[in-house]
Amino acid sequence: MSLEIILTEDGSNSIKNTIIDECYHSTSGAIDESQHIFIQNGLQAINKKTINTLEIGFGTGLNALLTQIECDKKKINNNYHSIENLPISSKDYKKLNYCKQLKVKDDRFLKMHNSTWGKETPISKYFNLLKINIELEKFNLKTQYDLIYFDAFSPNKQPELWTYNIFKKLYENLNTDGILITYCAKGIVKRTLKEVGFEIKSLAGPIGKREITQAKKK
């Protein structure tokens, strides 16, 4: 991969994949975007004290870090599974300024990145992480989840991940009242989610984005 560390408008870093010309986060603000989409409209929408979470795209680890912070604060047990086909290098993740921006120590963030792929690792009292180095299409889901962070590259860049078959697989491995949350608000994506069986809500997006999509299994 050819990656470049960039600075977004809220002062936090993101990474740009220069080969496909796409950033891992909104340039309007990486932390603001992840907090708004995945924490406020994902994690906080699940009313449980023990949550199984699946993340599609570990990326920089920002969603995992924000989730761990929120779960520790609210005393929510989170079994967090994250799929990533192309992990970033230690050279890159050590440059990211999330912990400085969030005013937290970097030990847990580094522990997430340094944890062994394919092995569940306790990051804090309430947060266990399992990173899986595999393509989503090849991943055999064995867990029923309460929450899915769908944070893959956009449909224009990774169309193979935004299909009926992928969403159907995720739907079948989501508990009743479980939520799939994504930054993508494209009509074709919402129609596909609805066709699979999800109940769709278009929610206000973070700064720089008009809408996001929350899909619930009923």
Which residues does each predicted region cover?
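Core SAM-dependent methyltransferase catalytic element
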Residues: 196-218
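A short glycine-rich, Lys/Arg-flanked "PGG" loop and its adjoining helix->strand segment in the class I
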Residues: 160-176
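Rossmann-like AdoMet
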Residues: 1-51, 69-98, 102
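S-adenosyl-L-methionine
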Residues: 92-142
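Conserved S-adenosyl-L-methionine
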Residues: 57-59, 84
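Glycine-rich SAM-binding Motif I of class I
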Residues: 61-65, 87
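Conserved beta-strand signature within the Rossmann-like core of class I S-adenosyl-L-methionine
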Residues: 147-149, 176-184
